[in-house]
Amino acid sequence: LAIPDTLCRMDWWYRLEFNSPVPTEGREAWLVFKGINYQAEIWLNDVCLGTMKGAFIRGEFNATDHLVDGKNTLVVRILPPPNPGIPHEQSPSAGNGMNGGQLCLDGPTFISSEGWDWVPGIRDRNIGIWQDVHLRFTNGIRLHDTQVVTHLALPDTTVAEITVRTEVENLQPIAKQVSVDLNLEGKKVTQEVNLAPKERKTVVFTPDVHKTLELKSPRLW
């Protein structure tokens, strides 16, 4: 059975019907895509919420005004990569072909899926939805891109110093005072943050300020 290479040169459509409540006043709804390869258009109830480009980019789309009470229809259009390459199993006898790097021209993606000297080409180039999709509700405040950094004074591994960063966003048109709580091994630390309307701030928890973040006898990987 020959699998055609045209699979990576055409659009693909995903369609899902789901039931959801409509956000109440002061709340928001977000459609979150953890990973799509390589380009996509996102449609909810016949409204285009936006686009995504890049296999390792997350997409978050405000669905607050587009959800209906009851059945909703989510449609995702996957567009083919601009430079899909040509599958060609390289060997001393077959010579070199346009594989093993052509997908890099588009940006970070699964570059070996076009074929290499150690793998045959994947005919659809692994395009499609490859990570989870969520519908998330917020209550006027949203956290973004939380990062945890661990420092060990190697070769000593008896204490780990942990630094946590996160972005806090006020989605409301009024000022907000927000408590950001961090729970580590059952111990909680808190920072109070004042946010102007629609403001976004970086909050950092460091072991210099919060001694709880000096973790003794850490469980090493």
Which residue ranges define each predicted feature?
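Secreted/periplasmic carbohydrate-active enzymes, especially glycoside hydrolases
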Residues: 1-221
